[in-house]
Amino acid sequence: MKKIRAAVVGYGNIGKFSVEALEAAPDFEIAGVVRRQGDKDKPLELEPYEVVDDIQKLSNVDVAILATPTRLCPDYAEQITKLGINTVDSFDMHHFILDYRKKQMENNKRTETVSVISAGWDPGSDSVVRVLMQALAPKGLSYTNFGPGMSMGHSVVARSKKGVKDALSMTIPLGEGIHRRMVYVELEDGAKLEEVT
């Protein structure tokens, strides 16, 4: 059986765990990892793999797992499908999903590729389980509570703000599907909180 050659684009938490999942999957092989800095300061665990700064430097890639900050997924998906490579992502900006799907579907038709979008936890697996529960118990209440814990996506967004050195976003459940978000930031030297918020 021919193995599916997958590239991992981005090497934060999602990228690291994507590599681990691919290593455990008998029907996949890792075509390489794409990082902004390429193979400079290459992590030891990536020693067996080709690490590049552009997916075009990898050969025979069947699918790219987009492990980038969520707001960058649409651009990466568009660029990568133009190369004839399929994509998978965990895009989680709920209010933009339909627009992203529509635009990416047009790209996929043009390039004869496939893009699986928003295939993470929420939206994704959690959404599927919620719909199944609503089908099984249509008169019940289907709340989804998150936390307590760190929100990776919101932490990444907070860190991307000019003047922020580091940030942590926590999700605290209040019950009945309602939660509170607490964001902690460490400012860069000279930055003012009023300019960051």
Residue ranges and their predicted role:
Residues M1-E29:
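NAD(P)+-binding Rossmann beta1-loop-alpha1 motif at the extreme N-terminus of oxidoreductases
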Residues V9, N13, F17, A135-T197:
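Active-site-lining helix/loop region of Rossmann-like oxidoreductase modules
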Residues F17, A24-E45:
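NAD(P)-binding Rossmann-fold cofactor-contacting core
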Residues Q37-D54, V156-V157:
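N-terminal beta-loop-helix "entrance" segment that forms/cooperates
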Residues V51, T87, V114-S115:
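Hydrophobic beta-strand scaffold residues
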Residues D53-K82, H94-L98:
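Beta-loop-alpha module in the N-terminal Rossmann-like domain of NAD(P)-dependent dehydrogenases
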Residues F91-S115:
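Rossmann-fold NAD(P)-binding glycine/threonine-rich loop
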Residues T111-M152:
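Adenosine-phosphate binding glycine-rich loop
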